[in-house]
Amino acid sequence: MDSELDRPTWQLPPGVTRGTWDYVHSGSIATQYDSFHAGHPLLEYDRRLVLEQAAKIKTQGLGRIPVALDLGCGTGRVMLPLGQLGWRVLGLDLSQSMLVAVGAKSTREDRERIGRVRANLAQLGCLQDRSIDLAYCLYSSIGMVQGTENRRGMLRQVHRSLQDGGVFVVHVHNRGTWWQDPGGIRRGVGDWIRSLRDKSWEYGDRVYAYRGLPSMYLHIFTEGELRRDLQESGFAVDRWIRLDRTSSGELGFGWCLPYFRAGGYLAVARKSQ
C-alpha cells in the first residue's frame, strides 16, 4: 500500500488527482468516516431519496431481484440499507479501506446481497450493459473526478450499464455559494482567470486542506453544468432538487436566485427508452 501511495503523479489513474489519491489511501479517513459525518443532514436526506426511488422500482414488478450500483460507496451508508430491503447492490470505491469498512459492518446476510469492487469512477468499462436498475453517486463523489471529459465519460458508462428506463441519482455542491464565503469573490475571480491560463484547471475546481490532507480536490458545479453533463450523456431529468444552504431539504422559493442560494443539487435522472 505504501509503494502504491508513492506512485508518481504521472502514473495516477485517469481523473484522479494527487489529493484524491492521498484521500483514498488514508486509513483514518475510512475508519473515522461515520463518526466524522454523523448528523450531517444531507446524508440522511439523500439516503431517503435513494430508498424512495428503490421502492418505486420494486413496485414495477420486475420479476427478478433488482440490482443497484453505488458509485463511491464509502462505508456503505446507503448500500447496506438497500441490501436489507432485498436488493443486490454492487458498491464501487477507489479506497480499499472504505471497502474493508463495509465488510466489517456487514452481516452474513448482507454479504449475500452486496458486492464490493475497488474501482476508479473514471474507468467503469467493467460494468455490464443494461445490468443495473438503480445507480447513485452521492455526496458530490462525482466532483472528485477531475476533468469534464472524465466526468462525462463516467456518466456515459453509468448510462450504458442501466436497464432501459433505469434511474440514476446524483448529488453535487453548488459553485454559487462561493461568492458568500469570506474571500469568495477574490477566489472566484482568481480561479476563473487561472482556468483561462492553465489547461489542466477548470473553473469550479477547488483544492483545499481537508482532515490532515494538504490538497484535497473537488469540482464544484453550477446547475447548468450538471444538467448539460447529464443531457450529453443520454439522461433525462425526472426531478431536480435545489437544496437549501445546509443541504437539509429543498430550498424554499427555489426559483429565486438559486445560483446564490442553493447549497447543492440532487438530480433524479432516467435512461431514456
Please describe what each predicted stretch is.
Residues 2-72, 262:
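Conserved class I S-adenosyl-L-methionine
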Residues 77-123:
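Class I SAM-dependent methyltransferase SAM/SAH-binding core
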Residues 126-135:
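A short acidic, Gly/Pro-enriched loop at the edge of an enzyme's catalytic core
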Residues 134-149:
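A short SAM/SAH-binding and catalytic strip from SAM-dependent methyltransferases
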Residues 152-164:
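A short glycine-rich, Lys/Arg-flanked "PGG" loop and its adjoining helix->strand segment in the class I
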Residues 169-229, 239-247:
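SAM-dependent methyltransferase
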Residues 254-273:
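Core SAM-dependent methyltransferase catalytic element
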